[in-house]
C-alpha cells in the first residue's frame, strides 16, 4: 500500500461493484482491514462484519476502523469454522518478520492461544449479500458452518482458491456447484500497472480466488467459468478480461 498506493484493488472494486443498495458484507480472515475498511468507506450504506482470529491483527483492524471513523464496521476477534467452540490459533508476535497474510491454522509457530470459533450462520445477518473468505486452506471448514447462508442463495461469495491448497479449492468448488451456484475463476493482483504510485515489479503477483454467484445474478465482469472441482486455474491475463481496465493485455 505504501509503495504502490493500492492493495488488491481489483478484488475491492469487484466487491464494491456488486454492492448495490444496502446490505451486509462478511470478511472472514480480514487481517488489518485492507479490503473490509476501504469497502466500508466506499459503501457507507452497508454493514461490514470483519472477522480476524489473530489477536494482534484484530487489534490493528479495530484501531484502523475507529481511527477512520468507519462506524458501519463490526470487528470480531474470532475464527470462523464448522461449529461454535474454542480452538488454538497461532499467537505470533507482530514484531516477528513474517508474512501475516499467510497465517492460518496450518502455520508452524512456537505458541498458540485459545480463541473462540464462530459459524457464519450465527454471525451473518439476514441481509448478507457478500461474503469474502481468505483463511489459508481452511475455507471448506468455514463453509461447513454456513449451511443456512449457503442454502438461501442470496449472497455472492469471493473465496481464496490457491494452488498451495488444491484439495481445499476442489472442495470449495464442489460445495458451491452442488448447491446450484455458478462458479468462476477470479484473479486479483496485489498491485496493478495503473497503481497511483510506483508500478509493481511483478504485476502478475496476486491471489487466486473463485467467485460463486447465486441463481439469477449476472456475470457482469465476464469471469471465466469453472468447469468442475478438478480444474486448475487458467494462467495468463486473457483468461481474466476484466484485468484490461487495470493495464493488463
Residue ranges and their predicted role:
Residues 155-158:
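Proline-aspartate-enriched helix->loop->beta-strand connector
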Residues 1-64, 68-71, 107-109, 185-194, ...:
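S-adenosyl-L-methionine
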Residues 58, 62-94:
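Core alpha/beta nucleotide-donor-binding catalytic domains of modification enzymes
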Residues 76-78, 181-190:
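Conserved S-adenosyl-L-methionine
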Residues 66-68, 90-96, 150, 169, ...:
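Short, hinge-like loop/turn segments at secondary-structure boundaries
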Residues 39, 61, 89, 142-146, ...:
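Hydrophobic packing residues within well-ordered alpha-helices of enzyme cores
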Residues 3-26, 86-91, 102-153, 164-167:
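Short internal loop-to-helix segment that lines adenine-nucleotide cofactor pockets
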Residues 53-54, 136, 160-163:
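Short strand-turn motif at the edge of the Rossmann-like AdoMet-binding core
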Amino acid at each position: 500500500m505504501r509503495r504502490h498506493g493500492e492493495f488488491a484493488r481489483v478484488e475491492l472494486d469487484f466487491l464494491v461493484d456488486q454492492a448495490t443498495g444496502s446490505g451486509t458484507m462478511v470478511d472472514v480472515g480480514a487481517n488489518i482491514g485492507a479490503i473490509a475498511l476501504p469497502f466500508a468507506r466506499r459503501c457507507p450504506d452497508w454493514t461490514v462484519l470483519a472477522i480476524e482470529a489473530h489477536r494482534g491483527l484484530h487489534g490493528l483492524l479495530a484501531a484502523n476502523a475507529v481511527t477512520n471513523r468507519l462506524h458501519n464496521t463490526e470487528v470480531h476477534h474470532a475464527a470462523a469454522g464448522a461449529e461454535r467452540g474454542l480452538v488454538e490459533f497461532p499467537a505470533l508476535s507482530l514484531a516477528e518478520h513474517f508474512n501475516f497474510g499467510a497465517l492460518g491454522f496450518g502455520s508452524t509457530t512456537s505458541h498458540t492461544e485459545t480463541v473462540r470459533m464462530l459459524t457464519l450462520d450465527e454471525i451473518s445477518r439476514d441481509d448478507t449479500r457478500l461474503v469474502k473468505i481468505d483463511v489459508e486452506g481452511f475455507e471448506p471448514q468455514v463453509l461447513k458452518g454456513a449451511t443456512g447462508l449457503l442454502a438461501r442463495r442470496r449472497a455472492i461469495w469471493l473465496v481464496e482458491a490457491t494452488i498451495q491448497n488444491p484439495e481445499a479449492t476442489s472442495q470449495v468448488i464442489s460445495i458451491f456447484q452442488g448447491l446450484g451456484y455458478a462458479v468462476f475463476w477470479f484473479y486479483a493482483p496485489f498491485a496493478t500497472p495503473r497503481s497511483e504510485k510506483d508500478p509493481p515489479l511483478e504485476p502478475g503477483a496476486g491471489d487466486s480466488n473463485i467467485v460463486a454467484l447465486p441463481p439469477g445474478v449476472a456475470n457482469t465482469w465476464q469471469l471465466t467459468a469453472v468447469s468442475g472441482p478438478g480444474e486448475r486455474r487458467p494462467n495468463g491475463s486473457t483468461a481474466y478480461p476484466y484485468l484490461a481496465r487495470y493495464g493488463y493485455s
